[in-house]
Swiss-Prot record:
Disulfide topology: C4-C21, C8-C23, C13-C28
PTM comment, free text: Contains 3 disulfide bonds.
Protein's UniProt keywords contain Cytoplasm: no
Pfam family name, one: Cyclotide
Protein family: Belongs to the cyclotide family. Bracelet subfamily.
One example of a Gene Ontology biological process annotation: defense response
UniProt key word Transport: no
Record note on domains: The presence of a 'disulfide through disulfide knot' structurally defines this protein as a knottin.
Gene source species: Clitoria ternatea
Protein name (Swiss-Prot/TrEMBL): Cyclotide cter-E
Site of covalent link Cyclopeptide (Gly-Asp): G1-D31
Keywords on record: Disulfide bond, Knottin, Plant defense
Function according to Swiss-Prot or TrEMBL: Probably participates in a plant defense mechanism.
Length: 31
């Protein structure tokens, strides 16, 4: 539920994905 300051509209979460973030509603979120 916490925004990870990365978008995933065109490409998946990259840097923030390593921190555990996942794509939700076109934005990378962490819980």
């Amino acid at each position: 539920g916490i925004p990870c300051a990365e978008s995933c509209v065109w490409i998946p979460c990259t840097v923030t994905a390593l921190l555990g973030c996942s794509c939700k509603d076109k934005v990378c979120y962490l819980d």
